[in-house]
Design a protein with these regions (language model features):
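The alpha-helix within a helix-turn-helix
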Residues: 35
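Short helix-coil-helix linker/hinge
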Residues: 10-18
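DNA-recognition helix of helix-turn-helix
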Residues: 38-62
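Residues within the helices of the helix-turn-helix
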Residues: 32
């Protein structure tokens, strides 16, 4: 199942990427909210989110 595969992928992802991805995609937090919550700059949040999304997208292609 794709949801199980996504959960497994996120569990194996680096923590710094997983946290940002979950806060944005699951908790629907803004970049500003994430940056304040994690004490990071917004550019760091955007970079980590881009890397996390790239990781997810690469694996999603394998699931098709």
């Amino acid at each position: 199942m794709k949801i199980e595969a996504l959960a497994k992928l996120l569990a194996s992802a680096p923590e710094e990427l997983r946290i940002v991805w979950v806060l944005r995609e699951v908790d629907d937090m803004s970049y500003e909210e994430i940056s304040q919550t994690l004490n990071l700059t917004e550019s760091t949040v955007r970079g980590r989110l881009a890397r996390a999304r790239s990781l997810v997208m690469r694996h999603m292609k394998e699931w098709e």
